Amino acid sequence: MQQDSAFLLVDIVLVLAALLPLWLAIGFTVRSPLNFLQVLLWMPAAMFTAFLWRSRLHGRIPEDIDGAILISNHRSSADPFFMQMASRRPIGWMIAREFASGPLIHHLMNILDVITAGRRGVDTAATKRVIREAKAGRLICMFPEGRLNTTEQFMQSCRPGAIMVAIRAGVPVIPCYLHNLPFSNVIAQPFYTPARVSLFVGEPIDVVKLANGQTDKATLQRVTIHCLKEIARLAGIHDWEPEMAGKNWLKDQTS
């Protein structure tokens, strides 16, 4: 009888332990703008950022901000996980369409409401969607480099798309800097590589005011360089000069 009671107690403990993540997800969903499925997907990401990558957050995205474009250096496939640490609100992000082509990945990206875009040329449909959603109050993360930086450079050449989107949506740009990500362009590598990552969040930049509402090439380049230098300042770098990407930026990167 005592042995049966012990087994029953163990079974109850195991069931409760198995249900704990579910109860946590339900509780967080009630308090969060994320829906239940998004919470279930983000919970493992939160575990990775807290324990495997021992992440530290310096600054947060203002809770009362009505839409913004987040920009950051881009070192790993896990970068969006760190960006989400900075806000209770769901942060959307853009990824290259080829990385969401598989049926399972495509379904997961739909749940997370990720925006897919082509990397060659201008993806008009994706750009219009980002402008529309940022204008409606959503936080969107865009990486000006447009590809992973696996070089020794602070940042590679950048494009002005994120700044153009922010100006047309009438929202600020929030610069962020990810520090100490020792990862490569192997997508899975971050998930088995311990690290001590820090995310620095800067002050919102009124790019509409800086650009006087204009999106001509010269204005976009000037405002983009200003925003990129703010990322460098978060890294403690004050003498870095950003490089703007040319038309063949992707070809140059892969050659």
Whereabouts are the PLM-identified features?
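A generic structural signal for well-ordered alpha-helical segments
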Residues: 48, 86, 109, 133, ...
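N-terminal signal-anchor transmembrane helix
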Residues: 28-67, 107
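Glycine-rich, highly charged phosphate/nucleotide-binding loops
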Residues: 54-56, 121-126
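Residue-level "edge-of-site" marker
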Residues: 61, 122, 179
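Non-catalytic C-terminal accessory region of glycerolipid acyltransferases
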Residues: 2-15, 125-255
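Catalytic core of membrane glycerolipid acyltransferases/transacylases, capturing the structured
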Residues: 63-121
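Hydrophobic core of alpha-helical transmembrane segments in multi-pass integral membrane proteins
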Residues: 13-26
